[in-house]
Amino acid sequence: MSINLQNVSYTYQAGTPFEGRALFNINLDILDGSYTAFIGHTGSGKSTIMQLLNGLHVPTTGIVSVDKQDITNHSKNKEIKSIRKHVGLVFQFPESQLFEETVLKDVAFGPQNFGVSPEEAEALAREKLALVGISENLFEKNPFELSGGQMRRVAIAGILAMQPKVLVLDEPTAGLDPKGRKELMTIFKKLHQSGMTIVLVTHLMDDVANYADFVYVLDKGKIILSGKPKTIFQQVSLLEKKQLGVPKVTKLAQRLVDRGIPISSLPITLEELREVLKHG
């Protein structure tokens, strides 16, 4: 499922003394089956774009096209409902949205809300809970009895149970320890390998380098760079000026260049660095 934004602008609280422009004439494509990352400083417009992708917001001007279905300023909620089923949005700290009395019921709620039978919803819930690493002995537990990492997995399973074609992740590993972050990113990688389109908002440049195949860089509501991670992370000075930084490996390689060691193309992953050091 592909997504296209055409001349999209968004203004919060439009027509009031408190209005603020969040996005300015955004044009972008998210290709079917891609793993697209959005990076930018706080207030750059990343989260606003995420909420436009599944119709949580509608554009003030312009068109958001999801699988050839258009969302405009005039779109009604009932017209957007099918888009929300196909574009799953995982907020920061999604565990805050848990509410049912058991893990299984919480994950099954979403599919039932979209008209799936209780039996099929439970089957989907079991399947997705297993996929995110929640063991069956936890299914009848109250979600709030689980650890923070387990609660987040349950919340993500709830989104996956609605069988989205696109998964939008807004800082999905925020607050997790390195082990939990790695495990969660591995789950998303496997989903992408299975054919799902992944959209990631993150401030962790190593994750962008290791997982994404395309990157948009936002600043003050505008796209200032776009391209493959390898190309984007060659712009070390610009990214550091925007307080975004680069992958750790890239930063190390840049220091070597600054000391006179010739490196024609800065590596962005550990594997690439090994190749550079091996072959000179």
UniProtKB/Swiss-Prot annotation:
Cellular compartments annotated: Cell membrane
Taxonomy, superkingdom: Bacteria
GO MF annotations in UniProt: ATP binding; ATP hydrolysis activity; ATPase-coupled transmembrane transporter activity
Top EC class for this record: translocase
Classification via PROSITE patterns: ABC_TRANSPORTER_1 (PS00211), ABC_TRANSPORTER_2 (PS50893), CBIO (PS51246)
EC code: 7.-.-.-
Binding residues annotated for ATP, in chain numbering: 40-47
Keyword Transit peptide annotated: no
Lineage: Bacteria, Bacillati, Bacillota, Bacilli, Lactobacillales
Protein family according to the UniProt entry: Belongs to the ABC transporter superfamily. Energy-coupling factor EcfA family.
Subunit record text: Forms a stable energy-coupling factor (ECF) transporter complex composed of 2 membrane-embedded substrate-binding proteins (S component), 2 ATP-binding proteins (A component) and 2 transmembrane proteins (T component).
Name this polypeptide is given: Energy-coupling factor transporter ATP-binding protein EcfA2
Topological type in the membrane: Peripheral membrane protein
Record gene name: ecfA2
An example Gene Ontology CC term for this record: ATP-binding cassette (ABC) transporter complex
Keywords per UniProt: ATP-binding, Cell membrane, Membrane, Nucleotide-binding, Translocase, Transport
ABC transporter domain segment(s): 3-245
Physiological role: ATP-binding (A) component of a common energy-coupling factor (ECF) ABC-transporter complex. Unlike classic ABC transporters this ECF transporter provides the energy necessary to transport a number of different substrates.
Gene source species: Streptococcus pyogenes serotype M1
Coiled-coil regions listed in the entry: none
InterPro entries, per database record: AAA+_ATPase, ABC_transporter-like_ATP-bd, ABC_transporter-like_CS, ABC_transpr_CbiO/EcfA_su, ECF_ABC_transporter_ATP-bd, EcfA2, P-loop_NTPase
A Pfam family that the UniProt record links to this protein: ABC_tran
